[in-house]
């Protein structure tokens, strides 16, 4: 990293701002990020862990430009201790998140068939069956029920496990590992133990599926390894983040339901116009802050100009999809939830070649959860005052920890 960075206009670079990991009780926007957005389109930040500082892009057009620009890469991030949110950082070979082209496309091809629109459409009846069984359970027992524990957690686990090809007997163990990996509360040692457990299990599973013709992800990876298209280490590194991905659906929908349960006008709108829920879900996806801070950095592979500022080769850059989704130049009155907002080109699932692999699957699960809970629980409401709902702490993915409801 360069010792001094100057703008192309000769002005001094923006100051480096500390960005602590905040535990926010509720869906409110991160106040530090809001301040950084006001400061300018390109700022510099220092996160709780790692070394040095990084650039932060918050404007919609800049976020799209950077995430589409091959002059910014991810592969080098794995070799450096860049300033970051997570206390532990040991990426594995094969992870799509850190692959640059052409490796990214080669790896993604190995599993793409499991995440197509067609594959997701075929899965939908089975997913609905799983969800109906969970709702049947809480209806049989009667209210109150914690929707996070009883529905929002087990449903994505079961659906992702169907897609991945996880045997039913292993599903709870796999979920326990994923929970520990994405938490920031257990420390590096606990996360590393969970990673060893999960990736050891994945290695055994991929080996066992060698030569398989199945349509699940582990069978696809076993077959791809057998054909020499990906290495075993790459297959394991590719599968891990896909297995963990169900956590995002749990907590995104948890935030959506919290908003509907605490803002009567939103719930009324969703119930009165079920045919327009697709547009409404897009707006909720745009508005919610699905994560703490920012995700994964990129490295400038050569000098790049952004907003009149020279980002030097070797300097790290973060983009904020949360900030981009609140850009007033793209989303008028961006802090207001407008369930009729159209067009709504939100970036909730990312952008560029790192666009979420499971976006179609995640969207399908989100639609089923919201539709089914609203239709089968017509009197759905919180069982406790809103301020008593516990929110997740020391974690990268935001959302209510519990959602006690009655109906």
Curated annotation (Swiss-Prot):
What positions does the entry give for flaviolin 1 binding? 92, 199
Its Gene Ontology molecular function terms?
A: heme binding; iron ion binding; monooxygenase activity; oxidoreductase activity, acting on paired donors, with incorporation or reduction of molecular oxygen
UniProt xrefs under SUPFAM superfamilies: Cytochrome P450
Q: Name one GO biological process term.
A: pigment metabolic process
Q: Which UniProt keywords apply?
A: Heme, Iron, Metal-binding, Monooxygenase, Oxidoreductase
Keyword Plastid carried by entry: no
Q: Per its UniProt record, what Pfam families does this chain match?
A: p450
List all Polar residues biased stretches: 1-11
Binding positions (heme) = 356
The record's catalysed reaction(s) read: 2 flaviolin + 2 reduced [2Fe-2S]-[ferredoxin] + O2 + H(+) = 3,3'-biflaviolin + 2 oxidized [2Fe-2S]-[ferredoxin] + 2 H2O; 2 flaviolin + 2 reduced [2Fe-2S]-[ferredoxin] + O2 + H(+) = 3,8'-biflaviolin + 2 oxidized [2Fe-2S]-[ferredoxin] + 2 H2O
Pathway, according to UniProt? Pigment biosynthesis
User: Among its keywords, does the record have Cell membrane?
Assistant: no
Q: EC number(s) in its UniProt entry?
A: 1.14.19.69
For flaviolin 2, which residues are the binding ones?
A: 290-291
Where does the entry annotate site (Involved in determining product regiospecificity)? 90
Q: Where is this region: Disordered?
A: 1-20
The cofactors required by this protein are: heme
Additional comments on file?
Answer: The structural studies suggest catalysis likely occurs through proton relay via a 'proton wire' formed by water molecules in the active site.
Q: Which family does it belong to?
A: Belongs to the cytochrome P450 family.
Summarize the protein's role: Catalyzes oxidative C-C coupling reaction to polymerize flaviolin and form highly conjugated pigments which protect the soil bacterium from deleterious effects of UV irradiation (two isomers of biflaviolin and one triflaviolin).
| The protein, known as | Biflaviolin synthase CYP158A1
């Amino acid at each position: 990293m360069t010792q001094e960075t100057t703008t192309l206009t000769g002005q001094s670079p923006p100051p480096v701002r500390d960005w602590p990991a905040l535990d926010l009780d509720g869906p409110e926007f991160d106040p530090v990020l809001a301040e950084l957005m006001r400061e300018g389109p390109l700022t510099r930040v220092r996160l709780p862990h790692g070394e040095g500082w990084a650039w932060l892009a918050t404007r919609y057009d800049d976020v799209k430009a950077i995430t589409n620009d091959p002059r910014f890469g991810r592969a080098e991030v794995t070799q450096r201790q860049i300033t970051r949110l997570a206390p532990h950082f040991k990426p594995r070979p094969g992870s799509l998140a850190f692959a640059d082209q052409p490796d990214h496309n080669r790896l993604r091809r190995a599993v793409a068939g499991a995440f197509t629109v067609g594959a997701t459409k075929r899965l939908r009846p089975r997913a609905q069956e799983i969800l109906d069984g969970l709702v049947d359970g809480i209806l049989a027992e009667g209210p109150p029920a914690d929707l996070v524990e009883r529905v929002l957690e087990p449903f994505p686990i079961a659906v992702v496990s169907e897609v991945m090809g996880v045997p039913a007997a292993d599903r709870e163990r796999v979920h326990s590992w994923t929970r520990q990996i994405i938490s920031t509360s257990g420390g590096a040692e606990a996360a590393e133990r969970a990673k060893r457990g999960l990736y050891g299990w994945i290695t055994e599973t991929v080996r066992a599926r060698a030569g398989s013709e199945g349509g699940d992800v582990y069978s696809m990876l076993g077959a791809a390894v057998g054909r020499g298209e990906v290495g075993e280490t790459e297959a394991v590194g590719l599968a891990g983040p896909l297995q963990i991905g169900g956590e995002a659906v749990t907590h995104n929908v948890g935030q959506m339901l919290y908003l509907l349960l605490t803002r009567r006008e939103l719930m009324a709108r969703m119930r009165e116009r079920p045919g327009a829920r697709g547009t409404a879900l897009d707006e909720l996806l745009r508005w919610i802050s699905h994560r703490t801070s920012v995700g994964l950095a990129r490295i400038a592979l050569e000098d790049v100009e952004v907003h009149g500022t020279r980002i030097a080769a070797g300097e790290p850059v973060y983009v904020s999809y949360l900030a981009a989704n609140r850009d007033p130049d793209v989303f008028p009155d961006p802090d207001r939830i407008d369930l009729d907002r159209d067009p709504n080109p939100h970036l909730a699932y990312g952008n560029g070649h790192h666009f979420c692999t499971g976006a179609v699957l995640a969207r399908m699960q989100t639609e089923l959860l919201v539709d089914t809970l609203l239709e089968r629980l017509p009197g759905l409401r919180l069982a406790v005052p809103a301020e008593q709902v516990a929110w997740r702490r020391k974690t990268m993915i935001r959302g209510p920890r519990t959602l006690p409801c009655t109906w």
